[in-house]
Amino acid sequence: MNRPGDPTVEELMARIAALQAENHQLTERVVKLEEELALARLHRFAPKSEKHVDRLFNEAEQLADKEDAGDEDDDLVELPDTGFPPTDKPQGKKRGRKPLPEHLPRERVEYDLTEDQKACPCCRHQMHRMGEAVTEQLHIEMKAKVLQNVRFKYACRHCDRTGINTPVVLAPMPAQPLPGSIATASTLAFALVHKYVDGTPLYRLAQAFEQAGVPVSRGALGHWVIGSSERHLSRIYDALKLRLRSQPLIHGDETTVQVLKEKDKEATSTSYMWAYRSGEHSDDPIVLLDYQPGRGQVYPQTFLGDYRGILMSDGYTAWRTLNSATHIGCIAHSRRRFVDALKARKKGGGPPQQALRFFEQLYRIERQARDKKPDAGETQADCIHRLRQQHSLPVLNALKSWLDDIAPKVVPDTKLGDAVSYTLNQWDYLTRYTSDGMMPIDNNLLERDIRIFATGRKSWLFSDTVDGARASAVVYSLMLTCRACGIEPLAYLRHVLSELPQRATSADITDLLPCNFAKAAAARSNIDG
């Protein structure tokens, strides 16, 4: 019998239910925080490369039965056998020093015995030279010189004697990239490559000039960068942008950049470099960065306009607002979420391991499809499409069934829950690549280009002004496009910074685009050969 004031059974049951709900919420929060702590430790102390991820995956696969016995073993399923042959293990790279390139000029430095050393130590007769021992070393030296541009003046003595006033005629010289500047096209190219290819901040580049006995201020270097971009290189950028819009396939992504002096924004705020790239097998490889202050949908819409081709991107909704494009998703983004879920686990194995097994099989099929010789009358794209339909689709169907099965069982607000939710929500986009052999499976091609920008960002940290950020976008775009075309950035910049000042703003510059520069260089090489 309850005493007066004691809670009723219903009230006690309600309290128990509330405590149980609170305990469940706290348990989920603890799981989430433990995952975040585990990932933070990995990001701080462990390698961040995919090789480290593969080590985690392999260890988890080997130890799954021992360490993860229990209910989760029910989630492990056999992968479908599509009849695809196993992948041969790639041969390791040969070790050892590579020979010095044959195209480098050779300079002989000879060492001979003195006359008294040429006498035989045994009989003291004169020894004869029987050969030579040659070793090669790489010698690099930096040289700076001053070009004196001497322009001869001419006047008419006959007119002078007759009292006729005639002007002095001065010999012309080619237009310079930055009129009034001490920098030649070669010097500008040198500075741009050091900053945007080697990732050298301007203050360190100024120090390097100082150490070489050529004092150049950081402000002058900044003027060289922005001036080269605004006056000349932006013309190449605009031409590449027009060509990119006509590509059948475009990769899209974005990454952060900080600009200190930007109107209506704090110095610590985040701006963005939007990245665009043509397909891997395009005849005109193009990589463009576009600086913008935000991450809204208006930026890709403005850049690409009514683009009607294939657009590869991650799950960010701004890309999907381009209604005219055919959108495909990035399998690698989904895979990385399961990688994070595997890293966050206290023990290996479980559902993250199972998911990675599916992805591994999908990528194995891609590698073999890419290397397979097409059948008679079949294009490479047709061959890839056929193999995807035959082998990739069964794996994807099995993955979808498995995800549908485990989705109700996982805690939503965890790394595994995020991975499962993302993959299911993006499923139509992630699997669309199987419908066309021209479509890539992921966005890794562009992400490798962005990684070069991100590496440089670690050195120079931020852009001081908006003009500097836009100049960086232009120069990085040309450097990355040169890389995609397989041409040397320094040689390319020397050429275009010498040639563009000679051409009117409305002149045709098609021959100066990186892809055409590469074709011309290849043609010259064939002629010389």
Report residues per predicted region.
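Catalytic center-proximal scaffold of phosphoryl-transfer enzymes
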Residues: 2, 88, 117-119, 128, ...
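Short, flexible loop/hinge motifs at secondary-structure junctions
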Residues: 1-178, 182, 251-252, 313, ...
